[in-house]
Amino acid sequence: MTALPQLISLLHLASPALPIGGFSYSQGLEAAIDCELVRDATTAERWIRDNLLHVQAQCEAPVWLLLHRAWQTQDHASVRQWNDWFHATRETSELRLETEQMGWSLAKLIAQMGWGDDASRDLLRDMRPVCLPTAFSSACVALGIAAREGLAAYLFNWAENQVAAAIKAVPLGQVAGQQMLLGLHQAVLGTVDEAVCRADAVPPLLSTFSPMLGVLSARHETQYSRLFRS
C-alpha cells in the first residue's frame, strides 16, 4: 500500500489543478463528437474505455513504465530513447504539440518545485522536446511514487480530462460525467495490468496502431468550430 506522504504527492500530481493545461485537449474526442461517433453518455464512455484498453494500454502506458524504470536507475540514455520514441509515435501535429506543451509545462514545474536530483532536472531542461509521460514519470520517481500507483494516477487523470471534455462538447450533465468516471475504474486498472505485461516483455510489446484516432486528430486540425486544441 502507498504510504500516506506518497499518496498525498500522488494526489497532487494527478490533480486537475496541476498547471499543465490538460483541460484544453480532447485527443480526438471532439472530432469523434463532430462525426457523430460519440453522441451521448453511453457512446462517450465506450470511446474513452476503448481508448484506454486499445490505445493507452498498448503504447503510452507501457512506455510510461519504461520511463519510470529508467529514471529510477538513472539510465538517462534510455530516458532520451523512450522520450524520442514516444514523440515519434504522435501521428499528427496536434498530438505532438499536446505532449510537447504539457511535458514542457510539467518539466518547468518540476524545476520550480525542486523535485528530484540536479541531474534529472538538468536532463528534463535540456531535452527538446520533453513529452508528458517523460516528465510525469520523472516527478513520480522524484516523489517516491511506485510505478503502478503512478501509472494509475496518470491514466485516471487522462480519463478525467476526457470525461470533462465530453461534458462540455457532447454535452452531458455533471452526474453523467461522474457515472462515466466510476464506470472507467476497472478499465484504468486493466490498462495498468496490461501495460505492466507489455513493459516486462523482452523486447517490450508496443503497438501504435490506432488509425481512427489518427484520422480524427487530423480532421480536428481543420474542424470549423472547436473548443479544444486536440
UniProtKB/Swiss-Prot annotation:
Major subcellular location class: cytoplasm
GO MF entry, a single one: nickel cation binding
Source organism superkingdom: Bacteria
A GO CC term assigned to this protein in UniProt: cytoplasm
Keywords carried by this UniProt record: Chaperone, Cytoplasm, Nickel insertion
Statement: the UniProt record of this protein carries the keyword Ribonucleoprotein: no
Compartments in which it is found: Cytoplasm
Membrane spanning residue stretches: none
One Pfam family per UniProt: UreF
Subunit description: UreD, UreF and UreG form a complex that acts as a GTP-hydrolysis-dependent molecular chaperone, activating the urease apoprotein by helping to assemble the nickel containing metallocenter of UreC. The UreE protein probably delivers the nickel.
Family named by the database record: Belongs to the UreF family.
UniProt xrefs under HAMAP family: UreF (MF_01385)
Entry protein name: Urease accessory protein UreF
Species of the source: Cupriavidus metallidurans (strain ATCC 43123 / DSM 2839 / NBRC 102507 / CH34) (Ralstonia metallidurans)
Gene responsible for this protein: ureF
